[in-house]
Amino acid sequence: MEKWNHTSNDFILLGLLPPNQTGIFLLCLIILIFFLASVGNSAMIHLIHVDPRLHTPMYFLLSQLSLMDLMYISTTVPKMAYNFLSGQKGISFLGCGVQSFFFLTMACSEGLLLTSMAYDRYLAICHSLYYPIRMSKMMCVKMIGGSWTLGSINSLAHTVFALHIPYCRSRAIDHFFCDVPAMLLLACTDTWVYEYMVFVSTSLFLLFPFIGITSSCGRVLFAVYHMHSKEGRKKAFTTISTHLTVVIFYYAPFVYTYLRPRNLRSPAEDKILAVFYTILTPMLNPIIYSLRNKEVLGAMRRVFGIFSFLKE
């Protein structure tokens, strides 16, 4: 029996899972994914921290990606699981704001960080002689700090606006977390100006970085094609193809969701697409970056004593 005990200031999250055995099975699957994502990203952060061979700009950026993914999935899954198991779909006004802030911060910051990682690979492969100068430790810190700062500022602006618009009597958000576009459907005022700002924000933090990433990857692939060293060509292609896989899996559903007009969106489709960038991507990223990377596998063998059958 579902209990919807809530005050007039609370929101209701209608959720993702049906209240039956299928929902229980899917929840168990999501909890397993959450566990794998937590272990995988925590292990990646630990490896990069303790292994001196991974103390390079590329892996420093990768450790930040793992941290963002860890916070990303922790923002949505625990609350979704608690609501499903307890039957209480409510979330407080403040809790909704906090969840929305962290979700948007991770979303924007990760998009900018992926752009920084693509730029790092572009410099390493296309301008290897100047790489130590252009990609210094200070530059790496600035890129990471800029990603977090810009993501937080953008998130704060969206969250403050979403919490200050007047809402109608119904406060049932047809989503499994406090997604701002889903919250706007409950507004009692015209939100076309804000929807336009969402479009602009999505373009600045997702679409334009995606175009920049694909452009730099194209330059890298062109340079890789003209490499004389077969081993170097293989290593460079593996690195860039791995990053492209992560980028496409993250950006495609995000851009498709947030750049569509309201009349072309459906809550059911938005929730399914959100599963990709809030649940699946944080689990897949450490797997993709580790299984195709000999240096990471070697670090696992040295630090954790696993994969000892693999040669570095």
Swiss-Prot record:
Q: Transmembrane stretches, by residue range?
A: 25-48, 57-78, 100-119, 139-157, 195-218, 236-258, 272-291
**Quick one: a GO cellular component term?**
plasma membrane
One annotated GO molecular function is: olfactory receptor activity
**Which one Pfam family would you cite for this protein?**
7tm_4
- The disulfide bonds in this chain are 96-188
Keywords on record: Cell membrane, Disulfide bond, G-protein coupled receptor, Glycoprotein, Membrane, Olfaction, Receptor, Sensory transduction, Transducer, Transmembrane, Transmembrane helix
Where in or outside the cell it occurs: the entry states:
Cell membrane
Please name the GO terms of the biological process aspect recorded for this protein, alphabetically.
detection of chemical stimulus involved in sensory perception of smell
Q: Does the keyword Cell membrane apply?
A: yes
Gene3D superfamilies associated with the record: Rhodopsin 7-helix transmembrane proteins
Which residues face the membrane's Cytoplasmic side?
49-56, 120-138, 219-235, 292-312
Q: Which family does it belong to?
A: Belongs to the G-protein coupled receptor 1 family.
Name this protein carries in UniProt: Olfactory receptor 2L13
Species of provenance: Homo sapiens (Human)
